[in-house]
Amino acid sequence: AFRYEFTYKSENLEELAKAIETVENTEILSIGKGLELIKDLGDATTVADQYGLNKFMGTHGIGHTRMATESDVDIKSAHPYWAFPYQDVAVVHNGQLTNYWGNRRILERSGYRFNSNCDSEIIAVYIADKMAKGIDLEQSMHDSLDELDGVFTYIVSTKDQLGMAKDHMAAKPMVIYEGEDIVACASEEVAIRNIFPHEIKTYDPYEAEVKVWQV
């Protein structure tokens, strides 16, 4: 795997993204100043070893090892999802959105572009669109619980915030641990407990719950 870093002085990130895509066999997966997205096939250990993730330095991260049920099995359809062309908004999602195509058509008519047919991508674009209109992350996520139909739990990452939302039916699991200087979220409690050498206290968010942490 290759990683390249360069400086771009213009604020027109969509122009940059489209310019990169003119290079043959090149696809842009994310853009921004605070987040770096790694998308590939394989389990967490395989991807971490391939990209040297143990050497990454940062304040927070999100990831998702999933079984594709309604999308292709390829890098483009892997999580996390980025909201093209906004910088530093990424989402991982567990569940199904039943009004995906309706919301997608609305956003496409507003000029948004989608890079996959996975319903998870709509959440990233939806949140980025709300925030571009001046709505903060927490309120954007609360709005999503009423405007996105289906069963879902998702996590959003920006350059300085981490948020989780659970739909009104709360059918998709989420477990949270909040320590003095760390927050961990996972679909299964064992995934969190395997990280910490000491006993921890976790909790399950309620239905229609949203939490946002500053990082």
Language-model features, listed with the residues they occupy:
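Conserved short alpha-helical segments that host acidic/polar catalytic motifs at enzyme active sites
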Residues: 1-215
